[in-house]
Regions:
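Start-transfer (signal-anchor) and selected internal transmembrane alpha helices
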Residues: 1-32
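Transmembrane-helix signature of polytopic, membrane-embedded enzymes
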Residues: 122-144
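Specific aromatic-rich, kink-prone transmembrane helix
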Residues: 162-173
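Membrane-interface junctions at the ends of membrane-embedded or membrane-associated helices
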Residues: 1-7, 127-131, 173
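Hydrophobic alpha-helical transmembrane segments
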Residues: 13-17, 108, 137-141
């Protein structure tokens, strides 16, 4: 039993590393931060999300309130922003970045979320279909690298749904 658990963890680690390596190579080739001067901040990420993450950074460091912000339009409750944009438990990682490193944080979160989507899909394939290592790695890497993930990496909060979907499917099964 112990060998089965260790084997499962190693398989999930490999499933995590493959798409992370692919994304890092792409970021290096394209010169995207942290490997270059370009960022993942385009469209909504540039116009809205970086400010939301700046607010979250302030909250995590005790400089702002979770409930209200005077910086929201003319001031207002923040529950909608938190629930829709920045409420992911993964965003706690922002605490370890400087406020000036929001672009780096967002790039890191794209990499992390894509890797985690591979892990959850690999785990699903392992438990649901008992696939061998190679087919499961190919399918989980394909799942992690699908166009939806790449396209919506600019709105990385949507990637949380891709991470959780295989777990939900496993629960339904």
């Amino acid at each position: 039993m112990k060998n089965k658990v260790v084997n499962s963890r190693i398989r999930c680690l490999i499933a995590f590393c493959i798409p992370v390596l692919i994304i890092c190579i792409c970021f290096i080739c394209l010169g995207i931060t942290p490997f270059g001067d370009k960022t993942v901040l385009i469209w909504d990420a540039k116009l809205q999300h970086k400010d939301y993450y700046g607010y979250l950074w302030d909250v995590l460091h005790g400089k702002a309130s979770l409930q209200y912000s005077a910086g929201k339009s003319l001031g207002g409750r923040m529950i909608g922003i938190i629930g829709f944009y920045i409420g992911s438990p993964l965003n706690i990682v922002l605490y370890f970045f400087k406020k000036t490193q929001i672009a780096e944080f967002m790039a890191f979160m794209v990499i992390l979320r894509i890797g985690l989507s591979a892990v959850t899909s690999h785990y699903y394939l392992l438990k649901r279909f008992q696939l061998d290592l190679l087919p499961a790695l190919l399918i989980s890497t394909s799942y992690a690298m699908m166009e939806y993930n790449i396209y919506y990496s600019r709105n990385n909060m949507w990637l949380d749904g891709v991470i959780i979907l295989p777990i939900v499917a496993l629960g339904v099964w």
